[in-house]
Amino acid sequence: MSSLPADSRIDFAGSPRPTVGVEWEFALVDAKTRELSNEAAAVIAEIGENPHVHKELLRNTVEIVTGICENSGEAMGDLCDTLSTVRRAVRGRGMELFCAGTHPFGKWSAAQLTDAPRYAELIKRTQWWGRQMLIWGVHVHVGVSSAHKVMPIISSLLNQYPHLLALSASSPFWDGEDTGYASNRAMMFQQLPTAGLPFQFQTWHEFEGFVHDQKKTGIIDHLSEIRWDIRPSPQLGTVEVRIFDGVSNVRELSALVALTHCLIVDLDRRLDAGEQLPVMPPWHVQENKWRAARYGLDAVIILDADSNERLVTEDLDDLLNHLEPVAASLHCADELAAVEDIYRLGGSYQRQRRVAEENDGDLREVVDALIGELEL
């Protein structure tokens, strides 16, 4: 790659320790009808200035975020403190908090856009697809010490993309219909320009060159407009994993955060040991994303560049065993072990379908069940 202008350099803050942070998106639903409610602005105004409560693209959404935490357990404590504050304000206005990748019968046409120039510009550019973004997710940040590690970690972490998506898949329904997918959200979000799978760069210089080209050609104005499923967060000094569908309860969220934390720290330590991290051809990565979105925990995934395949839950058994020493060092062994409960007991998309079947297809009961899970 040719040399870049000096102003194209992107400074990566770097994290002295492998800390973790979480962003958790919630929808607001009417307590009686279970329909989405566009009252986020009023809720946030009532709560007042709070760095842990954010607005999002749609006025039916509130996001809560942690500070800088050492492990999953600390992050859950941070989130739960904020969650209790937000829930009081929400319930005081006749609403409930709901979290899944999609709302089972929500109508995108009824959603209102949050008043902010960047959101208006997004919809102006993306039009119909942008207005379809009636979706919710979880983002996990893990601190990385230096820029040269970031792209190798991201490129190798894509090997575990289907594991993370299958475990969190919680969006089988769209506009009142069963889509046949475990994660319809994953299929929807990638329709936005600059969203979807990251390019498998190996150096920070390649990433800087990509961003330079994106800005020069008017594709983006700001780095935050790169909406990859896994991306660098240079200001925070983190790798940000954005694969997860919305997670409806603290128990599963804690497990998924621990898994993400351990995966990235494991890759980081392997780099320190001089290992060249494994990567797969992008066509395998793309296929794995689709298989996990379609089949969830029943997906047979591609494991490596040699095209070997295996049931994702069987591979998770070995992955969890491999990560046990990392989890012990990060003081999240119990949280990592709880990952197994998700695929042994059933994922969110499976629970939602079961509730719908048991209630003659009444999707309000699905919303009720998900609201109830947040109490756990």
UniProtKB/Swiss-Prot annotation:
One of its GO terms (biological process) is modified amino acid biosynthetic process. It comes from Mycolicibacterium smegmatis (strain ATCC 700084 / mc(2)155). This is Putative glutamate--cysteine ligase 2-1. Its EC number is 6.3.2.2. Keywords: ATP-binding, Ligase, Nucleotide-binding. The lineage of its organism: Bacteria, Bacillati, Actinomycetota, Actinomycetes, Mycobacteriales. It catalyses: L-cysteine + L-glutamate + ATP = gamma-L-glutamyl-L-cysteine + ADP + phosphate + H(+). ATP-dependent carboxylate-amine ligase which exhibits weak glutamate--cysteine ligase activity. Pfam families: GCS2. Signal peptide: none annotated. GO terms for molecular function: ATP binding; glutamate-cysteine ligase activity. The keyword Nucleotide-binding applies. It is an enzyme of class 6 (ligase). PANTHER family: GLUTAMATE--CYSTEINE LIGASE 2-RELATED (PTHR36510:SF1). Belongs to the glutamate--cysteine ligase type 2 family. YbdK subfamily. Gene3D superfamilies: 3.30.590.20.
